[in-house]
Amino acid sequence: MARSVWKGPFVDGYLLKKAEKVREGGRNEVIKMWSRRSTILPQFVGLTFGVYNGNKHVPVSVSEEMVGHKFGEFAPTRTYYGHGADKKAKRK
């Protein structure tokens, strides 16, 4: 179920402050963050965030198409190694 419109998008407060500091400074550094649940806002476009996936910070460069999505969508938490091959077929 989608979030109610009257509530507005959720963004952690510290994230807004960090993004504002980087914009004011004019430098393009990676903003480390642990808030995968935060929504990407239009003012984040052009910035690079290091989204934590439980192991390391995955760099995510925010573009126009990402606005409205959550940061966690762009940093996968699980590694897919594929399904196991049939052992009988391997031996032949």
Swiss-Prot record:
GO molecular function: rRNA binding; structural constituent of ribosome
InterPro entries (alphabetical): Ribosomal_uS19, Ribosomal_uS19_bac-type, Ribosomal_uS19_CS, Ribosomal_uS19_SF
GO biological process terms held by the UniProt record: ribosomal small subunit assembly; translation
One cellular-component annotation, GO: cytoplasm
UniProt KW keywords: Ribonucleoprotein, Ribosomal protein, RNA-binding, rRNA-binding
KW Ubl conjugation (keyword) present: no
Stored Pfam families: Ribosomal_S19 (PF00203)
Top-rank taxon: Bacteria
Family under the similarity heading: Belongs to the universal ribosomal protein uS19 family.
Function: Protein S19 forms a complex with S13 that binds strongly to the 16S ribosomal RNA.
Stated name of the protein: Small ribosomal subunit protein uS19
Annotated source species: Brucella canis (strain ATCC 23365 / NCTC 10854 / RM-666)
Gene giving rise to this polypeptide: rpsS
